[in-house]
A protein has these predicted regions:
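Core subunits and conserved enzymes of cellular information-processing
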Residues: 1-116
Length: 116
């Protein structure tokens, strides 16, 4: 809990400018948590900066969603591109590789995670 305000922003869009791909949309988020003495407007600006950074990264999912998708990738295969590779993503990969018969590769330059 926080004594200040908090905000979460979501963007759902497609690579195509004409229409949203409802089967494979791109979902990115941005959030910020305030604290005592921080104006709500500043908290909102911080969340907007985060979602803008995620959109400009060209990723298909943000790092918060990416770490939750790791177990699904382990079970069904595939690949995702995220804005950054976090320690939580690495931890999820490590655990999945220990429990399941799966191996992951990470393209550190492009922030792409995939099963092999």
């Amino acid at each position: 809990l926080s004594p200040g305000s908090g905000i979460t922003l979501w963007a759902v869009f497609s690579k195509c400018d004409d229409d949203v791909d409802v089967i494979n949309p791109i979902r990115l988020g941005g959030s910020a948590l305030g604290k005592k003495g921080i104006r709500a407007e500043e908290v909102g600006e911080n969340a907007a900066k985060e979602i803008d950074k995620n959109i400009k990264s060209g990723s298909s999912v943000d790092s918060y969603l990416a770490d939750n998708l790791i177990p699904l990738l382990a079970l069904y295969g595939g690949k995702i591109k995220t804005d950054k590779i976090t320690n939580h993503i690495r931890s999820n990969i490590y655990v999945c590789e220990k429990f399941l018969d799966v191996k992951f590769e990470i393209d550190e330059e492009k922030n792409i995670i995939f099963t092999i």
